[in-house]
C-alpha cells in the first residue's frame, strides 16, 4: 500500500482551497502567482498537536504541491523528530504564493488582504484546541502568528509559541556576508536547542524519544526525509529524498522565473541502462 495525503476533502479546508486569493491580493511583481498557491503539509483531520508556520513555498514545493519539502522542510522534519512527533503536525506558510525578489515578502508583512485569508487557515487549525504548540520559522512567520494572535487572544493564550530561526538562516546569513556558513549554522542550532525544552514541555509526543540537543554542525539524522503520507496520491518516492532534485534555471531573469528543472536523483534511476 502507498499512503498519501487526501488533500482538502473536508470543510473548512475545501472552501479554503477553492477560494484562495489571486493576483489582486498577491501582486505578481512580488509573488510567483503563475505557479499557483501551495497551501499546507501534514494533518488536516484534527490530529495535529504542533503547527509549523513557515514563510513561503520554494522550488521543490512548487512541484510537490505541499510546503516545506526541500532542505528547509527536511531540517524541520528532523526538529519534529527530536520532539517525538512523527505524524501529529500540520504546516502552513505566511504566504501561499512563492515570494519573488528581495523584499517581496517584507513589503507585505502586515498586508490586510493577505492576512485575512491566512487568518482563516489559522482559525481552522488553532481554534479547535488540539494544537498545543506553534513553531514559527523566522521573522515573517513570527509576525504573522502575532497578527493572528491579536485577533484571537483567548486561543493564543493557551498556545506555546516557539519563534525559532528559519531553517535556511545559515545559507542566507552567510550569503549576505559578515558571518561564515559554519558560524551561522552553529548560531541556528544553538537557537533551536534553546527552544527544545519548552517545546517538549508543551507537546505530547507520538512516541517517546531521548532528549537530544544539536551540535554545532549538521549531523547524520538531523535532516529527515519527508513522509510519503504528506504528499499527494501517486507521488514518486524520490520526492521525499534528501537530495535536491529541483532548481530554477534560465539564462536571464525572465526565463528563470518561468522554468523549474527537475532531475531524478541517481539513486532513484532504477530503469535498465540506456545507450
What is the predicted function of each stretch?
Residues 1-275:
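A polyanion-binding, active-site-adjacent surface
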